[in-house]
């Protein structure tokens, strides 16, 4: 649905070149809720501007719904832009217009009939739960209600793609959760492909099925949300995951436990999915290695509607200890693991 092929984007200011994007490649599939996460300045919003053709790539290709728009003119982009909706962090509503007129604006600009406008706007306001607010003005609404108006406005043209640029950053946690639920409903009800730009890993965890992690203009990690949460490969991905899920004991706890440890030991970090939780993992490990297994840490969380568990296990070592058998067990059971000592 959206594809970036070795895309780079540079800006030139006062004899200085700023590389906003460097050789970015990834694909957003049809019906995805695809998250792009990174800190400020990572290049996330530049990607959105390329999809909207507000900026042109310096190098590479940008493919939208099968069209290579890299070198499209504004005129050539008109029909494609009709299939792209957009919501922003600060809503971008007209304060002098009612909720109804704000939602209707794209249809008014497209010169649709009054009958069609009334029908379509009424449908969208009902969908976002604001039918009773149609005659109110933005200043009379809460932040969450304003974002619902913005979502209705983005949907009123029946787009194929919805771009969300930090759409929940200005909202409190409870309101954020309700907006994410609404966006998931948008995806499921209308089959709209959603590209989420965010710096909040909780947004990725709660709504996205796939994610790209960006740092300094580059995509440093991509994968399913489960893959990235279960085994983040890069330091920045590990840092983002740790903001919403504690996946291992604190360094201070490890130091205290190590100080009390007698003899050599080996530690494992494992990631257990919901479908694996009925297996007697600890009991199996005790039988395999013939010794006690210490659980130094355990935490559970929910990712994409599935419960997952992170555990840190410790085995005392001696000459009879067979780490190969433990590794083989994890592989046979498809349990993701990492030796950490």
Curated annotation (Swiss-Prot):
Question: Which keywords has UniProt assigned to this entry?
Answer: Amino-acid transport, ATP-binding, Cell membrane, Membrane, Nucleotide-binding, Translocase, Transport
Q: Per UniProt, what is one Pfam family of this protein?
A: ABC_tran
Supply the source organism for this entry: Staphylococcus aureus (strain MRSA252)
Q: Which family does it belong to?
A: Belongs to the ABC transporter superfamily. Methionine importer (TC 3.A.1.24) family.
Output this protein's name: Methionine import ATP-binding protein MetN 1
Gene name?
A: metN1
- Which CDD domains does this one have? ABC_MetN_methionine_transporter
According to the record's subunit comment, the protein's assembly and interactions are: The complex is composed of two ATP-binding proteins (MetN), two transmembrane proteins (MetI) and a solute-binding protein (MetQ).
Question: What GO molecular-function term can you cite, just one?
Answer: ATP binding
Lineage top rank: taxon? Bacteria
InterPro entries in UniProt: AAA+_ATPase (IPR003593), ABC_transporter-like_ATP-bd (IPR003439), ABC_transporter-like_CS (IPR017871), ACT-like_dom_sf (IPR045865), MetN_ABC (IPR041701), MetN_ABC_transporter-like (IPR050086), NIL_domain (IPR018449), P-loop_NTPase (IPR027417)
As for membrane topology, the entry says: Peripheral membrane protein
Which enzyme class, named as a word? translocase
Q: Which GO terms describe its cellular component?
A: plasma membrane
Which Enzyme Commission numbers does its entry carry? Answer: 7.4.2.11
The task this protein performs is described as: Part of the ABC transporter complex MetNIQ involved in methionine import. Responsible for energy coupling to the transport system.
Q: Where does this polypeptide localize? A: Cell membrane
**Annotated catalysed reactions:** L-methionine(out) + ATP + H2O = L-methionine(in) + ADP + phosphate + H(+); D-methionine(out) + ATP + H2O = D-methionine(in) + ADP + phosphate + H(+)
- Annotated coiled-coil segments of the chain: none
The residues the record assigns to binding ATP are: 38-45
Q: Residue limits of the ABC transporter domain?
A: 2-241
